[in-house]
Design a protein with these regions (language model features):
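Short, extreme N-terminal segment that most often corresponds to the first beta-strand
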Residues: 1-27
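Charged interaction segments
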Residues: 23-138
Length: 138
């Protein structure tokens, strides 16, 4: 079975043209893993120059080729397009609740796109008051 995580990241550029050029450049590398990673992302946003990725309940090990490709996208965005706004924010939450955050986002601009929130949701059945074992102290 193995340890599973929920992961998400956002890559942002200064403008749509730069984002689209980045996607074209990554696809032009003819690297099967990079192509698969790009195809797993959303980048058709018409008003926001971002690339997004989200996966739940996945095995996200740093030595897996697909994981390396996703991290390469984030790092290449900064390495190649830093002067054109290339930056990213990555967050994963493991099945044990452990969080990992990696980012190159000096101004905190990407925080609005991706954050974490731990919460407990319950669906306890309703107990009629007369059957309740709850006692109050006076």
């Amino acid at each position: 079975m193995g340890y599973r995580s929920d992961v998400a990241y956002v890559i942002k550029f200064n403008d749509i043209e730069t984002r689209d050029n980045f996607v074209t450049l990554m696809l032009a590398k003819n690297d099967a893993q990079l192509t698969q990673a790009i195809n797993e992302c959303e980048y058709g946003y018409t008003k926001d120059p971002i690339i997004t990725f989200e996966a739940t309940d996945v095995k996200w090990y740093s030595d897996f080729d697909d994981v390396k490709a996703h991290h390469a996208l984030m790092h290449d965005a900064v390495e190649i397009y830093k002067e054109k706004g290339g930056k990213y924010r990555f967050i994963s939450i493991g099945e044990d609740g452990a969080e990992e955050c990696d980012e190159d986002d000096d101004d905190g601009d990407l925080y609005d796109y991706i954050t974490t929130r731990h919460e407990i949701n319950t669906a306890f059945p309703h107990i009629p008051t007369e059957d309740s074992t709850l006692t109050t102290q006076e």
